[in-house]
C-alpha cells in the first residue's frame, strides 16, 4: 500500500442565530458581565433554537468547507463527525452525509469531547496516508446548551453551540507534519456529562437502569491546572517530532476553552499574543467545534496564508488532549 501525504484544502463554520450575552446570563444566575469576562474572556455565545439540530449546523459548516476546497460532495470518501451531543445516539454523521449529498462517503461519529476535532483530524489523515481514501471531511460540532445546568453559574457561562469542518485530501506533499495524542481516564471525574439512571425492576431479582444524561459537571480549577501544564508539553513534543521550533510557528490555535487558558499556554511556550487566534469572546467554549470555528474566519479573511505553520491543540473530558502541527494548504 502506497503511503501518501495529506493537505488541508477547505474550512467552514456555522453558529446558531440566537446570541446569548452575558447580560442575559446575569438575569438567570448570580453573575455579571464583568465577572464572566474577567474569568473567561467570554462576552457572548450562540445557542441553538429548540428546532435546530446538530445535523443543521454540521451540514452548513461542511458545505462551506467543500465549497472552499472546490470539492463536489460526491467526491468525498470519508466523513468523521466529532461530537459529544449527537442528534441520535446511534450517530449523526450519516445524517450529515445524506444532507450534503456525499453519497459515496463512509460516515461515522467520533467522541473525544473538546479534543474531538483534533482526534478526528488525525484519524482521517491516517486513512488518507494509507491510500484507502483520497478525500475526507472532518466535522466538529456540539450543541452543549442541551446539557448545561442553567442554574449553575460555574458552567452555564462557558458553553456555546456551533460546528466547524475541514477538508483533507491526498497529496504528494504531507502538510500534517506531526501529532501527539494523549488520554488519562484517572482524571475523568474533573469533567463529565454522565448517564444518570433510575433502577427499574423487570422481574424478581431482575432490574435495569433507565434514564438520561445529567448536566455537565466540571472542576474548573483542576481543568485549568491540567490544561496549562499538559497542553504546552504535547505541542513541544509535536514540534520536536517535526523538527521545528516554537519560533517557526505562525499561528497557535487552541481549543477555545477560555481566554485565561489560551494566554497561559501561549506564555509558557513563549508565543506572542499576535500569533494566538481566539474567538472565545464571541463564541464561548464550543467543544469539538472550537478549533475549526477559530480557524475559519482568519483563513477566509486571508490572515492565514498558504504555507503558514499552524500549531493546534485540543483538550477536554476523558481526560483527553493532543496537538498537531500542519501547514495550511
From Swiss-Prot:
InterPro entries: ACP_syn_III_C, ACP_syn_III_N, FabH, Thiolase-like. It comes from the Bacteria. Gene3D superfamilies: 3.40.47.10. It catalyses: malonyl-[ACP] + acetyl-CoA + H(+) = 3-oxobutanoyl-[ACP] + CO2 + CoA. It is an enzyme of class 2 (transferase). Residues 256-260 are annotated as: ACP-binding. HAMAP family: FabH. Belongs to the thiolase-like superfamily. FabH family. NCBIfam families: fabH, PRK09352.1. This is Beta-ketoacyl-[acyl-carrier-protein] synthase III.
